């Protein structure tokens, strides 16, 4: 009798588990958040009127920074996005009917932006930041739709993904969304300024700052409980951009606005993936939107703007290093390999190389960013204010790991106020991570 009861319980549990799995895989639990009016077609006149607004929103969302190859046709896709599970390639989002989104209806586009589901019930991978665009208002999604449908159609085929993404894993994204796609709402605080609320809408939505600047879990889901506290992309650390962290690196609303609008500020210049953001997105945004983003990011939980910290004071052991110490070796390496461009006093050279003095990257607790720059260099960069920075050569084959560790330790102590020395193991790990 007991065995029969136990067997019945086991069968019941198995049946429930199978049914639950089928429900998840079929997406039955996922109620669409698309507004009912999206089922109606927009008139040609309305579409035309929405295009300018849509362009502004597309710039804020940096849509074409991901959906375009460098020097390639706008929106034609093909940009590689590395993940621990394989490489994804951004897709063609031009109105081409064969390879792009030319056959998307208004409702189709809304569902992509709000639910992360493409026509044919095709689950999108989270490289498409639908967990952020989910909060975008229906009117703004309409404007984006109108603009995307107005750009030149590019008959360019989409590239095939690699790794696990070649397998039929899209249905399993329903499991992913169950755990990693919270029903987020537009942040609205009537006790805060209109600028703060506008900045919150952009940062937490279309601009998807937290997509890179927040930690991710083992499933690559954004950890919203640690939003904007820093992340990692392609083995390179992405800095914490909470109010306290930005203020510690010397930013205030004017300097952060300048950085976003030009890619340059007293705290340094944008580079790597952030250069793409400032060059193609934030530098083209309306100035009032840029300021709103800066105000939101620099406002603490108490509702007050964080005050910028004073410039770091050089550590005594860096200013006057003792002979034979790693600090002395680091200073010597800087003078031999870096001072010619960055200056004996770290002052930099306008239109050639950024200053080390006051550089926010040196004030970061994690040295990965500077290690990566020393090892791999940076390309020539042209900024929207007309200035440029010339290419920095890689030093991976000129300096060994101990020399890089000493160099980075010294510049962080001299201009970043950092007391913790960089280890050979940290350099070696970064050499491996970026290969």
Tell me what each language-model feature is.
Residues 63-66, 209-212, 338-341:
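Short cysteine clusters
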Residues 329-372:
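C-terminal structural cap/anchor segments
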Residues 29-41, 69-87, 119-205, 214-239, ...:
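Flexible coil segments in periplasmic/lumen-exposed cytochrome c-class electron-transfer proteins
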Residues 42-72, 80:
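Short extracytoplasmic
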Residues 115-118, 262-266, 376:
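Glycine-rich, acidic and aromatic/proline-enriched surface loops and short helix-turn segments
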Residues 2-18:
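N-terminal Sec-pathway targeting helices
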Residues 99-117, 143, 249-253:
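Aromatic- and charge-enriched surface segment that lines or borders ligand/interaction sites
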